[in-house]
């Protein structure tokens, strides 16, 4: 039966100390993703190092540490199931490259849980100009995560004491902010749930501590999420993650189908190298499959192409149906974290799908209002943090990207410099590069 449930990708966002790990750990545990014995083992370890109060966060931290040390962990720990759906937590902001991952993402998130600390001064810190609450909410909307659930966490904090007035204050602030960022009909579409990620209030069952709250629990809100429509009817786009040479078989490119369908017998084109060939076979989890659909990570065997011809960052498409090609693009870019600001001529690295290529801001056409897209200045000489621009990007070597409106996963990117994400953007239009 289980196979019939829709799969939904979930991302958990919010300021550093909002309690994301505790909330996520508790949720996975409550939905049966982690057995009690594991929690108890972690809890003992936590108490030994004086962290007993972090038992659910400790679960995620331990999993993360084990992942970082290369110990394989049961990936089911990052999955849980509700009455209606299977959920996979695709990333949590504790990761160093969280913003880059969220953009170039191994997966597009279908829904975001925004965790907010309700404690006195804590909400204000996360919501301040330098806090991550704003940045993450803006990012989620820019990257097309249209469904959101807001958790007002730490309602059990002494400074809050399950206060309805504090909940309303935070809800009002955040409703107007999310509307500014670009979320529509926030009041109707985004649930605000007062919770305690540690004690479990309003996570699975309604809390006796907050009889004034009549809305859904976190679990009920997750069950109300609409499963995404996977784009099978679009032309094929498959960015390559790796290309292997396998003895006795030949060249095997590997990647995730983003749109369309990949089948044996198809003629495919790789961009920007403009190499075409026939697909001999398609495999997933070491088994031959008749077709690969969006979301599938696959390896496929191709005729007469060597590992020197195609590389990570190339894009595979259907030679007969809108094949991909090398492109230059105009993009809307939001500057997030640049020490001085971005000027024409700036040449950072752009991470778009699996491609990682230096691109020059050839021309900055305008500075715009982030939310409305209204032009504020034509041809600015510099665009600073928090501002949005329309820019012409020219890659230093051939690159294949697509417009965000046609192929979202190939149309959103991170701008990286000084080992951090300095800006994010979406491709508005492309032209075939000469």
Curated annotation (Swiss-Prot):
One of its GO terms (cellular component) is cytoplasm. Residues 5-232 form the tr-type G domain. Residues 153-156 are annotated as: G4. Its main location: cytoplasm. The keyword Lipid metabolism does not apply. It is found in: Cytoplasm. Residues 91-94 are annotated as: G3. GTP binds at residues 14-21, 91-95, 153-156. Residues 70-74 are annotated as: G2. Keywords: Cytoplasm, Elongation factor, GTP-binding, Nucleotide-binding, Protein biosynthesis. Residues 196-198 are annotated as: G5. HAMAP family: EF_Tu_A. Belongs to the TRAFAC class translation factor GTPase superfamily. Classic translation factor GTPase family. EF-Tu/EF-1A subfamily. This is Elongation factor 1-alpha. It comes from Blastocystis hominis. The lineage of its organism: Eukaryota, Sar, Stramenopiles, Bigyra, Opalozoa.
